[in-house]
Amino acid sequence: MADDTGTEEGLGCSGWFCVEAIVDKTTENAISDDEDENVDDSGLDLVDFVDNSTVIHTKQVHAQALLNKQQAHADQEAVQALKRKLLGSPYESPVSDSQHSIDNELSPRLGGLTLCRGSQGAKRRLFQSLENRDSGYGYSEVEVQQTQVEHGHGAVHGTMGNGGAVGSELGVQENEEGSTTSTPTTRVVELLKCKNLHATLLGKFKELFGVSFGDLVRQFKSDKSSCTDWVIAAFGVNHSIAEGFNTLIKADSLYTHIQWLTCTWGMVLLMLIRFKCGKNRTTVSKGLSKLLNIPTNQLLIEPPRLQSVAAAIYWFRSGISNASIVTGDTPEWIQRQTILEHCFADAQFNLTEMVQWAYDNDITEDSDIAYEYAQRADRDSNAAAFLKSNCQAKYVKDCGVMCRHYKKAQMRRMSMGAWIKHRSAKIGDSGDWKPIVKFIRYQQIDFLAFMSAFKKFLHNIPKKSCLVLIGPPNTGKSQFGMSLINFLAGTVISFVNSHSHFWLQPLDSAKIAMLDDATPPCWTYLDIYLRNLLDGNPCSIDRKHKALTVVKCPPLLITSNTDIRTNDKWKYLYSRVSLFEFPNPFPLDTNGNPVYELNDKNWKSFFQRLWSSLEFQESEDEEDYGETGQTFRCVPGTVVRTV
């Protein structure tokens, strides 16, 4: 083996070493003086040789945009450094939700120690701001470090660590700008974060308008209750919609009172609207939600207080100011409580006026009196005073009792002819008497014999004052009798109540009576106990909570499927009744309507046509019956004093 060049043996050294010479390049260029071969090459100069950051291709690069980008990046790094400086205990879990305690503030290392292991599972948050929302892609404790900074209002915001700081500069800048601006979306999210949204809206309303919403409205528990007047408070309305809402609602309303104020949630509208027809809360909320472009849970909708003077004055005073837009006629409940003449018109309740009204309108039932008179409160001062009273039930009962007394006394003073005219005056003149006559002839009854018995029946002649209609079922006996009783405002008694001592009490206050569908036990009862009643003679009647009274039985009409002539045990009733048989079924047309109409108008025409045949005399002094003289008055007159 040949000797290698540069290797010397001896002097206690042996081995190989490399000798490198500095030579010129083949290009024969001199080596640069800047290169220092004595410095160790660590490769740091090749770190930025490959740029992994996102390259944004633009057509033209502006110097100002580049400067802004650099400044934003520098600001971001300064904020990141400040956040790291204010970070709590380094031993606290980054996913922990525990609050910083006083010990943690004094000693982060001591505050990080716990006796029990807390829950490491992250809680799901229903409402999360856009900047804190993360898709979760690639999330791990190693790759992403979540830091928390506690702001003055107590909210905790998370920021990203070192990862992604270089490649997402533009996205970080947009998130920083979005977190400082307040948009309608963020305001709605903040509103929805409230645990009790209704209470929050009520509190904001009182803060803005200086008056409680409950002081202006009365509560409807049901959303289906209808009302024409509604008070609405709308939150978060756009400014352009608020200004044009008066025009949008004009087509559906008769009166509008609109005022608005500005708050952090947008425009807040307070409205008093009278719609053209009654609407419930659900209908109003759906309609206004579409017009105002807001959800229904941002609306407070209740009817106004109609009897509150303070509420009426609020609407009146705010309506005359320049802060409200008012269109239409002012509701009467505001005028009644604010205008001076209406205040003077308020008077105490007068029972006689209520009784006079019930008498004139022929209303004798307590429930009808209470309902009808309460509806007159908006145009009758006495009815308004009635509603304000705490004794409404007593007044209604007293009014009904007095009205029935007056009606009963008026009826007793009238003869049968006057009573028929009195009843006919309340019915129209478009009737026809022929269907009644045709129906009687259809039942194979001699019309002259019927008119003779009917005349004695109406005149209440003894032993001729009971008219009996017998025959098979469905022959029109009850239809014929009920139509006559309804025209003459008679009463009906039922044998089913015969076990009571008071079942004949209605005969005391009737001009004519009817006993429908008398069965054999009923005929036996009449034969044993009520022979004098069928005679038309005075008899004693027991009345509930009253003493016995002696009355003359009014004309009594009886219908039955039993022919008393076929049984001798009722022979003592033969001479006390006038009996007519209806053998034929009641006729109906193809549509199921009666062929012969038996109604009030036809009965009126029947009595007018056959008035002379019934031998009702024309009274010369009809004033005794209240027909042509002055009408009955129970209200004391007022004396007109001359000045």
Swiss-Prot record:
Q: Where is this region: DNA-binding region?
A: 180-346
Q: Where is the crosslink of kind Glycyl lysine isopeptide (Lys-Gly) (interchain with G-Cter in SUMO)?
A: K552
UniProt short sequence motif Nuclear export signal, positions renumbered to this chain? 106-115
What post-translational changes are documented for it? Answer: Phosphorylated.
Q: Name one Pfam family in it.
A: PPV_E1_C
Q: Which reaction does it catalyse?
A: Couples ATP hydrolysis with the unwinding of duplex DNA by translocating in the 3'-5' direction; ATP + H2O = ADP + phosphate + H(+)
**Which one GO biological process term can you cite for this protein?**
DNA replication
Example GO molecular function: DNA binding
What protein family does this chain belong to? Belongs to the papillomaviridae E1 protein family.
- Name the chain's protein: Replication protein E1
User: What species is given as this protein's source?
Assistant: Human papillomavirus 42
Q: Which gene encodes it?
A: E1
